[in-house]
Curated annotation (Swiss-Prot):
Any one of the GO BP annotations: glycosaminoglycan biosynthetic process
Active site: 272
Organism: Glycine max
Function, as annotated: Involved in the biosynthesis of UDP-glucuronic acid (UDP-GlcA), providing nucleotide sugars for cell-wall polymers.
Superkingdom of the source species: Eukaryota
Record has Transmembrane as a keyword: no
Enzyme Commission no: 1.1.1.22
InterPro entries: 6-PGluconate_DH-like_C_sf (IPR008927), NAD(P)-bd_dom_sf (IPR036291), UDP-Glc/GDP-Man (IPR017476), UDP-Glc/GDP-Man_DH_C (IPR014027), UDP-Glc/GDP-Man_DH_C_sf (IPR036220), UDP-Glc/GDP-Man_DH_dimer (IPR014026), UDP-Glc/GDP-Man_DH_N (IPR001732), UDPglc_DH_euk (IPR028356)
Alphabetically ordered keywords of this record: NAD, Oxidoreductase, Phosphoprotein
Binding site for NAD(+): 8-13, 33, 38, 86-90, 127-128, 161, 272-275, 342
Signal peptide extent: none
Protein name, entry field: UDP-glucose 6-dehydrogenase 1
Record's catalysed reaction(s): UDP-alpha-D-glucose + 2 NAD(+) + H2O = UDP-alpha-D-glucuronate + 2 NADH + 3 H(+)
Source lineage: Eukaryota, Viridiplantae, Streptophyta, Embryophyta, Tracheophyta
Length: 480
């Protein structure tokens, strides 16, 4: 029986291994992690991550051929294939701080694999890693291997949170990169055979190691670039009276461009886009390509600009001050159908409003109060380092209350900001909300999900990103 072990029970490792276990009943899959609480959650009814469809998959396989354990060494020792799905956060200090990936967790995983292995193994990079990581890992493994042979493969994930299970069941492509030696090709074939149990052969692509590593960074950079492109257009639309939804629809009907990732918003978030682009920028700089680095940096600059532009619009619209005004924040996760708040634009928007002394009342159907308070009191890039290195009791941000209901959040508020496109926000009773808000009542729709004309009929002053401005907003001072 082939045995697979995955180090790291997070957003990537957990769902990926659960689906492999479901689709390959003859393979024994173990997901290991040093976090006792995380493994306990995977073994309970309350999984540590929210992902539609994940519950069902885990329940079908857990205890049969899918196991979650803190006994890392035992399962690595037994495995034929070891997936490494540990965090690769952005470095917060030292060489390349703020851009380079921190490979501390990766390196310690590699050293541990070398230590405990008594038989040849295939080691698979699953986390997003900088190009040439495989080479570094290979050196660590071979120098500590005591005669055991390791083959390194790169098998980047292309999951979107909120649709991870669907993406795993029916992927656009599975990418496997390996060495161009006979041993390397044999390792690629072994992993290919696992995926081939449910993925059509033509969707399994094989490349060399570097191409596979770079493809992941490039894919995320291209996606983020599309969002920044449409967000840049949204600023121009507001200035000229064009409607960004009409513009992006017209552009998206061009079959060479296509309609996906062309929704203007308050900005992109998530654990990968910014991190991967910074990483790409760093790799370009290290390879003496400053023009290329500058090009990709601009994607992040536009994203930061879009978030600060939103905050400025809120403050400018409300008579240039939000001091001690209650503002309702609807949505805190970086997108709908996930509880993930990593790099969510909501953090920067909330911090911007708090900087102007606003009182915030926040509601998100999937994010806990503890998480929101932690996010708002954290330094940049801290979120990606393990919780035990973060402040233990997050200092409660005084002017923030977290509530469990949209109507509670908006009661007596001067304005409301929609920062996540949860479906439930489309069907709220906005008349009821209007009646319970201070007047004039403002809606700042950071996701373009509400019908602005209907809200104006109720009496709201509405700002939608990239849409012709409400006459009221035109009188306000221009946004700096």
């Amino acid at each position: 029986m082939v045995k697979i072990c995955c180090i790291g029970a997070g957003y990537v490792g957990g769902p990926t291994m659960a689906v492999i276990a479901l689709k390959c009943p003859s393979i024994e899959v173990a997901v290991v992690d040093i976090s006792k609480s995380r493994i306990a959650a995977w073994n309970s009814d309350q999984l540590p991550i929210y992902e539609p469809g994940l519950d069902g998959v885990v329940k079908q396989c857990r205890g049969k051929n899918l196991f979650f354990s803190t006994d890392v060494e035992k399962h690595v020792f037994e495995a034929d294939i070891v997936f490494v799905s540990v965090n690769t956060p952005t470095k917060t200090q030292g060489l390349g701080a703020g851009k380079a990936a921190d490979l501390t967790y990766w390196e310690s995983a590699a050293r541990m694999i070398a230590d405990v292995s008594k038989s040849d193994k295939i080691v698979v990079e699953k986390s997003t890693v900088p190009v040439k990581t495989a080479e570094a890992i290979e050196k660590i493994l071979t120098h500590n291997s005591k005669g055991i042979k390791f083959q390194i493969l790169s098998n980047p994930e292309f999951l979107a949170e909120g649709t991870a299970i669907k993406d795993l069941f029916n992927p656009d492509r599975v990418l496997i990169g390996g060495r161009e030696t006979p041993e390397g090709q044999k390792a690629i074939q072994t992993l290919k055979d696992v995926y081939a149990q449910w993925v059509p052969e033509e969707r399994i692509l094989t490349t060399n190691l570097w191409s596979a590593e770079l493809s992941k960074l490039a894919a995320n950079a291209f996606l983020a670039q599309r969002i920044s492109s449409v967000n840049a257009m949204s600023a121009l639309c507001e200035a000229t009276g064009a409607n960004v939804q009409q513009v992006s629809y017209s552009v998206g009907t061009d079959s060479r461009i296509g309609p996906k990732f062309l929704n203007a918003s308050v900005g992109f978030g998530g654990s990968c886009f910014q991190k991967d682009i910074l990483n790409l920028v760093y790799i370009c700089e290290c390879n003496g390509l400053p023009e290329v680095a500058e090009y990709w940096k601009q994607v992040i600059k536009i994203n930061d600009y879009q978030k600060s532009r939103f905050v400025n619009r809120v403050v400018a619209s409300m008579f240039n001050t939000v001091s001690n005004k209650k503002i309702a924040i609807l949505g805190f996760a970086f997108k709908k159908d996930t509880g993930d708040t990593r790099e969510t634009p909501a953090i920067d928007v909330c911090q911007g409003l708090l900087g102007d002394k606003a009182n915030l009342s926040i509601y998100d159907p999937q994010v806990t109060e503890d998480q929101i308070q932690r996010d708002l009191s954290m330094n940049k890039f801290d979120w990606d380092h393990p919780i035990h290195l973060q402040p233990t009791s997050p200092t409660t941000v005084k002017k923030v209350s977290v509530v469990w209901d949209a109507y509670e959040a908006t009661k007596d508020a001067h304005g409301l900001c929609i920062l996540t496109e949860w479906d439930e926000f489309k069907t709220l009773d906005y008349q009821k909300i209007f009646d319970n808000m201070q007047k004039p009542a403002f809606v700042f729709d950071g996701r373009n999900i509400v019908d602005a004309d209907k809200l104006r009929e109720i009496g709201f002053i509405v700002y939608s990103i990239g849409k012709p401005l409400d006459p009221w907003l035109k009188d306000m001072p221009a946004v700096a």
